[in-house]
Amino acid sequence: VPKSGRTWFRVMLSKYLSLHFGEQLDIGGYDETSTVLPNILYSHEIWSHRMTSSVRRRLLGFYICPESALLDKPVMVVHRDPRDVLVSLYFHARKRSRRLFQGSIAELVRDKERGAAAMVAVMNAWRERLSGKSDVLWIAYAELHSRPEALLTAAVALLGLDPNPEFVHQAIDFSRFDNMRKLENQGGLGKGFLSPRNAADPESFKVRSGVVGGYGKHLAAEDLIYIDRVLQDLDPFFGYSVSVERDSSPS
């Protein structure tokens, strides 16, 4: 599901790999010509498949990873409290998306394509799809705040590398919110997806807020009641079943 912290983790892991291999930082991801860095495909996969307006791409499964590759390769899944995701997605849909959303946040929460129910469907699909697979790392956005060292170390080990604690520390420091915002202001490391839509509007930045549990500032009580009802269908593995307004200050 988008807005779950993938870009943050992507920068963190990419920085580690650049240090580990002594290569220039590249957050682009998959590159068939690379002979040094591990080839990592960053994708929203099922979500992109559901959201594409191209009937041809949907029929061809353009965004879907073949099952053979999925079973053969290590997988990392970044997930986040759907309530926080919905708030972040709303600002993205209003400020950054090529298909700008014209409705209210309450309408987005209930939207069939990208609302709460769609998120639950995608998250459940991934849990079922990866059931029984041993080389999977589930990365909770909140834990990227609370224990980034442990998660990045686990990710590096999953890639078959011997983690270097100093490089882990440097990569985490590099990917902190303030530096990510500065990088975005400076051109997003040459990548359009890490560039602000409008530099004068903080809500249009890819790195917008970076907090855990801030959804209460934007979602009305009736929205939270609706989301809670939808989350009853979410696999309890994720732990997002009850509305608890958490500390909204960055870690």
Go through each PLM region and give its residues.
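PAPS-dependent sulfotransferase catalytic domain
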Residues: V1-I139, R208-S251
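The conserved 3'-phosphoadenosine-5'-phosphosulfate
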Residues: F21-I46, G132-K217, A221
